[in-house]
Each structure stands twice: as C-alpha cells, then as structure tokens.
UniProtKB/Swiss-Prot annotation:
This is Chlorophyll a-b binding protein type 2 member 1A, chloroplastic. Gene3D superfamilies: Chlorophyll a/b binding protein domain. Disulfide bonds: none annotated. The N-terminus of the protein extends into the stroma where it is involved with adhesion of granal membranes and post-translational modifications; both are believed to mediate the distribution of excitation energy between photosystems I and II. It is found in: Plastid, Chloroplast thylakoid membrane. GO terms for cellular component: chloroplast thylakoid membrane; photosystem I; photosystem II.
C-alpha cells in the first residue's frame, strides 16, 4: 500500500489530516483520504490484483484521522506519521518505531506475516489437545512434546497415522520445510513465477482462492480483523511458551487445572513457586 495522499486533480493541492499535500499519481494498492461531509473520514481504497483496479469508498471507524485510538478519547494526539492509512493503526507509537518510512514498511510486513504464523501456531497448539481430551488418539497431543517423537524408536507419524507420513529423519523434515516454505515465500515476495507486480503483504491471486478480497470494502475490514486477531495470537503463543517452561503442560491442560482449582493453579502461584531447571 502506498503513502496516503489527498484525492484531488493532477497539479492541484488539497488538505488531509490538517496538512497540505501535493497531488501525485496514485499507485496500486493505494489508500486515498477523501474529506467527508461534517468532518467524517471517508477512505478510498484501490485494490490491484493484476486485473482492472477496483476502487471503493468506505466510512470506517478503523481508518483515517477520526479512527478509533488506543485509549479512546483519552489517547491524545497521535504522531503525525500515523495517519490511519493502514489497518491496525491506533495512533500508538511511544518508541517512535514507525517514524522512519522504510523501517515502518518493513515492520508492517513482519508484523502481518508473524501474525499469520501465530494464528496457525495457536490453533496447532490448542486443537490437538482438545481432540485428545475428547477421545481422538493420534500420538502426542502436547505441542512442545510432539516434535520430539521423531527421535523415538518408532519415529513420528503425522496425525498419529503411519499411513500418512512416517517421519524418521529430522534432516529430511528440515529440507522439506525449507523447500516448501521457501517456494511459497518466494512466490509471495517476487510476485509469482512471472514476477507480476503484487503487494507482498496482500498478494491476492492464488493466495486468495475464495475471493475474499474481491469486495474492497470487505477487504479493508478483513485486514483490520486479521491484524487484531494476529496480535492476540502472538501474545497467546508467548503465553504458551511461558506455560510450557513453568508448568510443563499444554494450554488446555493448564486451563483445565485452573478451572478445577483456581486458587492453587494460577499465574501468581506458579510464578512464586517456579524454580528454573526443575
């Protein structure tokens, strides 16, 4: 997504978020600020997928200068470089990490990609335990113990079934992961085998087989939902890591223990009794 600009004619000048901006030619995947009636923020999104560009105007509480901020009405004035152009911008950057445009662009991509991995990872940590507690047997269900099964005498059976993939070599798994993930990431960043120009964060095309981004209004809202759930998933994964170190149990078992005896099974009780290495 390119830098936010005021939508106006070539060579003219117009105002957006209290600043005068010279109009330049819009680029693909561009979010254009358009002044709405009665001071309401209206956004125009341009979505390019190698086909004809589609533009849509949306009134959204998540974009623009009048968007929802991190402390609501008590947030104060957000930094000038956080204009509400991108999804998940709540006007909070006390460390100034977004002040440099190039660093900001890099960090945006890193956050979205890590959010997606965290959402998949959180599901992978929780779902096997849920199945195991409901009588479905497919090998080790605790997420941080499952991978170690490959070092056992019988190796690792995917989903607990030797008919699927029976893995006995950590090097073979590593090689497959590098090849498969490297190919997909290369496709995403380079724009496909023909090098078509795409947005590396939201490439669309084969990465959107259900056509969820076909409607620009819905696409803008989905971006916000994705980053919000992704941030929650990253915190969840951090919590799972801490739980594994402190309790030696998976998240579902920890939850069950807490519900059964909340007085003796809680963060404070574990923190005060935790001894590293034991």
């Amino acid at each position: 997504m390119a830098t936010t600009m005021a939508s106006c004619g070539i060579g003219s000048r117009c105002a957006f978020a209290g600043a005068q901006l010279s109009s330049v030619k819009p680029q693909n995947n561009q979010l254009l600020g358009v002044g709405g009636a009665h001071g309401e923020a209206r956004l125009t999104m341009r979505k390019a997928t190698g086909k004809k560009s589609v533009a849509a105007s949306i009134d959204s509480p998540w974009y623009g200068p009048d968007r929802v901020l991190y402390l609501g009405p008590f947030s104060g004035e957000p930094p000038s470089y956080l204009t509400g152009e991108f999804p998940g911008d709540y006007g909070w950057d006390t460390a100034g990490l977004s002040a440099d445009p190039e660093t900001f662009a890099k960090n945006r991509e890193l956050e979205v990609i890590h959010s997606r991995w965290a959402m998949l990872g959180a599901l992978g940590c929780v779902f096997p335990e849920l199945l195991a507690r409901n009588g479905v047997k497919f090998g080790e269900a605790v997420w941080f113990k499952a991978g170690a099964q490959i070092f056992s005498e019988g190796g690792l059976d995917y989903l607990g079934s030797p008919q699927l993939i029976h893995a006995q070599s950590i090097l073979a798994i590593w090689a497959c992961q590098v090849i498969l993930m490297g190919a997909i990431e290369g496709y995403r960043v380079a724009g496909g085998p023909l090098g078509e120009v795409t947005d590396p964060i939201y490439p669309g095309g084969n990465f959107d087989p259900l056509g969820l981004a076909d409607d620009p209004d819905a696409f803008a809202e989905l971006k916000v939902k994705e980053i919000k759930n992704g941030r929650l998933a990253m915190f969840s994964m951090f919590g799972f890591f801490v739980q594994a170190i402190v309790t030696g149990k998976g998240p579902i078992e920890n939850l069950a223990d807490h519900l059964a005896d909340p007085v003796n099974n809680n963060a404070w009780a574990y923190a005060t009794n935790f001894v590293p290495g034991k």
